[in-house]
UniProtKB/Swiss-Prot annotation:
This is Transcriptional regulator Myc. The gene is myc. It comes from Carassius auratus (Goldfish). InterPro entries: bHLH_dom, HLH_DNA-bd_sf, Myc-LZ, Myc_transcription_factors, Tscrpt_reg_Myc, Tscrpt_reg_Myc_N. Coiled coil: none annotated. Residues 177-254, 289-320 are annotated as: Disordered.
Length: 399
């Protein structure tokens, strides 16, 4: 809070006589129906009703029980504030800001704007600021001025803390110089330094918000990875263990996100390629090698890691993938062999499986008809041969 406002609250110059016209007319002996002549009366309903609200702002805090400070002590107190750089940055505003503060001394209050009380208050504050600037110039030239004791400074800090925080009233920051970012070389993360008059809860709140945002990002990444892992059919994918959320909540400074590259072993099959006769034996060898290697890796993981259920699931999934890959390869080879047996699609390497099956069905029906026709011809020829044999025997017997 600016020291001008705190001093205006602490050392106020108004007495009852100067502010008496701004209060309500209150008389205990007054009769509201028979007003006495020659005495000031409250405003009638026809008059401006807003004149009732021409009051000064909230009165300052009650004065302390200590003796009032003399003029020299007050100037010493001001010099103490003006001499310290840290306090000067956080408590004392610039010249531009003081002008804007005078212009907007009453902010966000529709009851005070545009009245004579606001003008008088601004005039008093401007006079106070002018006197403070003059005192500061005089005290800076005097290098042998004595420092104020710690009790006075503590009293001023407590009185400033009891006043309203200007960040609640003013929507914009006080000074840009008071908000500086400092990087600690020993820590990988940024630490923000707060002004001296700010509360310590703001830093903890910002750190909690950062931790919550990082936890949300990690949960989203883990959900995406789980969705990708649910679609495993043939390709072997190693499931990464989920990060324990208790470690994230317990850690005071969360560690930055680490992105790891995982190699996914994929086997692409060219279904349009010509079938090879040397494919069956290497497939069996590869199956044995992969099963043996998977069993060996599974045993090592069982010995090293306590989570044996995950390793067993990985071994089962890997074995299932190998068997499924072998089954698909055998099915593909059988389709290639069937395609080569059908004359219509034998030369078409890009024939679809449905076309191969349809042409194979038609070819089978035509072959069955040909078989029946040939069987009937064979039967006719057999009968004819029997007749010829019987006639030949008759001719031999006659001779």
């Amino acid at each position: 809070m600016p020291v001008s406002a705190s001093l205006a609250y602490k050392n106020y110059d108004y007495d009852y006589d100067s502010i008496q016209p701004y209060f309500y007319f209150d008389n205990d002996d007054e009769d509201f129906y028979h007003h006495q002549q020659g005495q000031p009366q409250p405003p009638a309903p026809s008059e401006d009703i807003w004149k009732k609200f021409e009051l000064l702002p909230t009165p300052p805090l009650s004065p302390s029980r200590r003796q009032s400070l003399s003029t020299a002590e007050q100037l010493e107190m001001v010099s103490e504030f003006l001499g310290d750089d840290v306090v000067n940055q956080s408590f004392i505003c610039d010249a531009d800001y003081s002008q804007s503060f005078i212009k907007s001394i009453i902010i966000q209050d529709c009851m005070w704007s545009g009245f004579s009380a606001a003008a008088k208050l601004e005039k008093a504050v401007s006079e106070r600021l002018a006197s403070l600037h003059a005192a500061r110039k005089e005290l800076i030239s005097d290098s042998s001025s004595n420092r104020l004791s710690a009790s006075y400074l503590q009293d001023l800090s407590t009185s400033a803390s009891e006043c309203i925080d200007p960040s609640v009233v003013f929507p914009y920051p006080l000074t840009e110089s008071s908000k500086s970012n400092k990087v600690a070389p020993s820590q990988p993360m940024l630490v923000l330094d707060t002004p001296p008059n700010s509360s310590s809860s703001s830093g903890s709140d910002s750190e909690d918000e950062e931790e919550e945002e990082e936890e949300e990002e990690e949960e989203e990444e883990e959900e995406e990875e789980e969705e990708e892992e649910e679609e495993i059919d043939v390709v072997t994918v190693e499931k990464r263990q989920k990060r324990n959320e208790a470690d994230v909540s317990d850690s005071r400074y969360p560690s930055p996100l680490v992105l790891k590259r995982c190699h996914v072993s994929t086997h692409q099959h060219n279904y349009a390629a010509h079938p090879s006769t040397r494919h069956d034996q290497p497939a069996v060898k590869r199956l044995r090698l992969e099963t043996s290697s998977s069993n060996r890796h599974g045993k090592q993981r069982k010995c090293t890691s306590p989570r044996t259920s995950d390793s067993e699931d990985n071994d089962k999934r890997r074995t299932h993938n190998v068997l499924e890959r072998q089954r698909r390869n055998e099915l593909k080879l059988s389709f290639f062999a069937l395609r080569d047996e059908i004359p219509e699609v034998a030369n078409n390497e890009k024939a679809a499986k449905v076309v191969i099956l349809k042409k194979a069905t038609e070819c089978i029906h035509s072959m069955q008809l040909d078989e029946q026709r040939l069987l009937s011809i064979k039967e006719q020829l057999r009968r004819k041969s029997e007749q010829l044999k019987h006639r030949l025997q008759q001719l031999r017997s006659s001779h």
